[in-house]
């Protein structure tokens, strides 16, 4: 199923009847993926135009980015680009209206309207099919006539990145309502906050407080920043093309048809999937950060070596940081956070993670994934409290061996949870059945040493980064050596990319 | 004024380390790194493209592997007559060239090679100094079928496998779609690392590729180019049906295509110029394959072969009916015992007479 998602054709239907301009645009930029030649050409053009405009015309630069971002989305679907722009305009107006009044009830009403509108759009596009189909199945099971036909999930068009920009808009409305930030007065700046193409389709989820302030700073061409941007973009491209797409060769066939494969192969596929999803999503995030840096903007860092986390709680402080902090600030804390008793906190953790699971996709698999992580967090909290009163156990867990063991156990749990991270729960359960009962079956056409090599290289890179060795080395390397390293990194990404690349997993969310 | 200068000093030196200067030097270093990176990338790309233009090692690894093997054989026995068998995977699997005595025989069968690929290969071999004394040329008639505006071999000879000169030849002489093929060629030249990446991995670390993409044809052949069919394989009806479905549209109402005829003509002309004797070979086929062309098409195939024989004065070895179905894996690729029998019969009926006629011992 994963590859079904990954290989799903871009939404082309609208282009057969759409305006000629948008059809032409779609031909130029058929899919909003950063590692394609079409995107690189588009980005080069935007960069050239953006930096050619003199610094004093800051607002013109912002408009250029807004227009480019709109075209970036419209090239995939112009109807949905208008939808996103329309809801953004309404969010802007709600924000301005909240800023214009001091009456608490009116402000609350406006904030609720903005939140409901965004959630409504999200539910209509993302969850309508799921809920209607579940309702249909439920009514049929009870012997009732649903009165409507079942929707084909493949025919339901979910706008790219809808979960990301609706969450950004919701956080803006809430922050304005709570007076954490001032409502944005400038329309182009607000449009850029939501539509900025590096983060539009797959995050990171930016906060208005972090981003809008950057739109006011005059941007200067800074070689250090450009270098950082290029470096991030290259690392992201390498992660995506050379690692994630290669790992897909190990896991996609198995997750597509788990029945056919033997237990050992399925275990390898689970390991490969854990690597794939990390490199795919963090690779995308790195590219987004790199692209933003090249335009003079700084986005939130979304990953911090999550597989080196020593417990699940730490994992969530390192994985998809922009989402986990969003869930903490706008779901967990409003639910009461850990201010109540132990059971109250556990309930809140479970609820937050369930919402996190549902955010990823309208399917039981994602909900189960969220629930599993919620349970892991609860278990971790219980274990943590248990260890607090046992000094020797605590000390043992804080030794090198203890930390290593905790990292391994955390990685094991998180990897098993990834099995649930797919729309079809039935397939996930088949994978679990295969994992925990020795069964014979097909093996993959690939040799496992490439998988182990990838694991080794990835681990070594993370350890080098964590130890700070890379930071020291980077500062001392002569510029030509560093530059040649960039070239080699890019060439290696191109060489190692499998001939049939896949889309980004997180684009579906 | 003196005082003013003194006042300025701390302003210029904001920190003991001289931070503004350090920042400038960091920026300069960043710019230099980026320029060097872009330059190195461009240079690597250009070198790669130049390398693929000069050598087929990365662009066409199967051909390059065969040519290397042939070169090694020729170095061992430089005075031997050279018997070359150009053809498709049917030839590659079927002809154990090492069994030929009294001459250096080499199986130059490569997957998907029809008359156009064979013509290109013969040109390359001539350039590399390998001029055969006797050439056995497979007439892979499904690939000679008139398939509309483009030759059937079009999708098989991908743009990344050929040099610029060969690209122009394919477009001008063999009916390859000019705009599309040029665009594809330019694309492969623009991002050679992406285009040739899996070939590079296939050469450096074949295990990193799925086993069906490891190009066994390039690495698994014996010294004489024979890719021996695996031991113990049996006829596979499922594979046969798949192959039949693949070839059916080309063969059922077969007519000779103009482009492949041009390629065949060129091959014969090249051979005549270099004094090479040519024998056309129709490779063995199972009954289901033989039944694919309708009676009219079959008659057209036979008459086309007769025309070629008359026009170019070559000998023809029609091996289509040499074996029963039990000798084929999928209806047209011989199994190991079939390959041994084919080789023995070809040597006796085709190679030895031709070699004798050429004065070999």
Predicted regions, residues:
Chain B
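Active-site segments of SGNH/GDSL-like serine hydrolases
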Residues: 196, 267-293
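Secreted/periplasmic serine-hydrolase-like ester/acetyl group-modifying domain
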Residues: 152-274
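Alpha-helical transmembrane signal-anchor/signal-peptide segments
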Residues: 51-75
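Hydrophobic membrane-insertion alpha-helices, especially the h-region
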Residues: 29-53
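Long, positively charged, glycine-interspersed low-complexity recognition regions
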Residues: 290-361
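Membrane-embedded segments
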Residues: 86, 90-179
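Short extracytoplasmic
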Residues: 67-98
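N-terminal Lys/Arg-rich, disordered targeting/topogenic segments
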Residues: 1-30
